[in-house]
Amino acid sequence: MAKPIRKIGLRKGKRKIPKGVIHIQASFNNTIVTVTDIRGQVVSWSSAGACGFKGTRKSTPFAAQTAAENAIRTLIDQGMKQAEVMISGPGPGRETALRAIRRSGVVLSFVRDVTPMPHNGCRPPKKRRV
């Protein structure tokens, strides 16, 4: 299970941020949720690893949900009412993290998938033989 997260004080102090951008980076190994303001300054962030999950448990949907809830807890304290969501990566936690953000009460103006797609660039890794 996830360890209880200790409250970390803000370095810059409280500031009112009415609108922001939530970036979800879902890889196969971890899920990172970063909250920025409109200019791109990071307000808060969380990841499955920072929430106390280790090893293969970091790549679970539940770990992604916990990371999203932790990142959003700080921005609600700072008064964020509206947000845009940018989802990147093919990981298993992308849908669950988005669901956790929707439940938080922040109004989402749009959800955009910004996963980089190659136009036949690098050769992909070989298939695993287990």
UniProtKB/Swiss-Prot annotation:
Record carries keyword Isomerase: no
Family matches, as Gene3D superfamilies: Ribosomal protein S11 (3.30.420.80)
GO cellular component: chloroplast; ribonucleoprotein complex; ribosome
One annotated GO biological process: translation
GO MF term set: rRNA binding; structural constituent of ribosome
Domain of life: Eukaryota
Alphabetical list of Pfam families matching this protein: Ribosomal_S11
Chloroplast found in the keyword field: yes
Keywords: Chloroplast, Plastid, Ribonucleoprotein, Ribosomal protein, RNA-binding, rRNA-binding
Subcellular localization: Plastid, Chloroplast
Alphabetical list of InterPro entries matching this protein: Ribosomal_uS11, Ribosomal_uS11_bac-type, Ribosomal_uS11_CS, Ribosomal_uS11_sf
Family listed: Belongs to the universal ribosomal protein uS11 family.
Subunit structure: Part of the 30S ribosomal subunit.
Descriptive protein name: Small ribosomal subunit protein uS11c
Gene that specifies this protein: rps11
